[in-house]
Amino acid sequence: MGQSKKLNNQPRSLSPLVLLSGISKSFDGKEVISQLDLTINNGEFLTLLGPSGCGKTTVLRLIAGLETVDAGHIMLDNQDITHVPAENRYVNTVFQSYALFPHMTVFENVAFGLRMQKTPAAEIAPRVTDALRMVQLEEFAQRKPHQLSGGQQQRVAIARAVVNKPRLLLLDESLSALDYKLRKQMQNELKALQRKLGITFVFVTHDQEEALTMSDRIVVMRNGVIEQDGTPREIYEEPKNLFVAGFIGEINRFDATVIERLDEQRVRASVEGRECNIYVNFAVEPGQKLNVLLRPEDLRVEEINDDNHIEGLIGYVRERNYKGMTLESVVELENGKMVMVSEFFNEDDPDFDHSLDQKMAISWVESWEVVLADEEHK
């Protein structure tokens, strides 16, 4: 965040594959997508991220042709597919349920789409075998779905989707049914497979960590509109508003009031009652309310004892959570606000494992903060 962690925002030379222009969609008179514009580039892994009901799955279904738009246009490879039936789009979808045929073998499940397309019989076996080899299931070709684990079923669904060589693969929360460890493994496998195939993936999830792990680009949605579109690092370190900041990982929000502008970058402000310099890249006036945002890992804490005087926000440790590599502390400021602090665990530091009710000073590296206008006092 800020100056010390400046992002590399070099433009990427990617060509557009899908263009959504002015897309609107309503169900039962309720608008779920509103004037949405989105470009999806060739060969990228793009994630639509947002809470339940934000419209992300509807966008996926509109691209797939499983729903029709009320307004706007969808282009695929410079062709208008707005009103093209789903079966005639070079787009395949992997659903949350995988939708495998229980009475068919793995081989026949993967071959199903090829047979429906009337692919020559001589081509089917080698293409299915290649697809199963890609997802490391070649030896499971004659098994039925019920004989496979959840992760293996997921890979069958992906093999069935890619065997048709689609231009675009859509995945609708397709990892959510897996347990935590298997989901982490599949995240890595899915990203590696996407790089190997070179197919554009559009992935829908409400899991922020999943989006950060897998994506080249994340589109954060709320109430049918795009709140922010950027790389995982941009979304995490440079949130554009309080919703994005709060939705992507843990973040602390401090109330601030402008005292005066010092120069083009810095403002003197009172942050939770403490005067300090903050980096503000927009026009402000004395007395204006601001939000200062800091991730738990960007905060520094130091114990205050009788014999030392330390600058910072003063508070007291109320909770401690040991998480292996990190120690998370909840610190209550003197004004009652709760602050989350995350530190890498250091067993060699005798002062590291803070005791409950220990008096602490909280500070941060100047310019690591993200500053936003106070949305409540605009």
From Swiss-Prot:
Nucleotide-binding found in the keyword field: yes
Stretch forming the signal peptide: none
One family name in Pfam for this protein: TOBE_2
Membrane topology: Peripheral membrane protein
GO molecular function, one term: ABC-type putrescine transporter activity
GO cellular component terms given for this protein: ATP-binding cassette (ABC) transporter complex
Keyword check for Repressor: no
Known catalytic reactions: ATP + H2O + polyamine-[polyamine-binding protein]Side 1 = ADP + phosphate + polyamineSide 2 + [polyamine-binding protein]Side 1
Entry's localization field: Cell inner membrane
Domain ABC transporter, chain residue ranges per copy: 18-248
EC number: 7.6.2.11
Binding annotation for ATP: G50, P51, S52, G53, C54, G55, K56, T57
Predominant cellular place of this UniProt entry's protein: membrane
Keywords for the protein's UniProt record, in alphabetical order: ATP-binding, Cell inner membrane, Cell membrane, Membrane, Nucleotide-binding, Translocase, Transport
Role: Part of the ABC transporter complex PotABCD involved in spermidine/putrescine import. Responsible for energy coupling to the transport system.
NCBIfam families: potA, PRK09452.1
Subunit structure: The complex is composed of two ATP-binding proteins (PotA), two transmembrane proteins (PotB and PotC) and a solute-binding protein (PotD).
Family: Belongs to the ABC transporter superfamily. Spermidine/putrescine importer (TC 3.A.1.11.1) family.
Protein name: Spermidine/putrescine import ATP-binding protein PotA
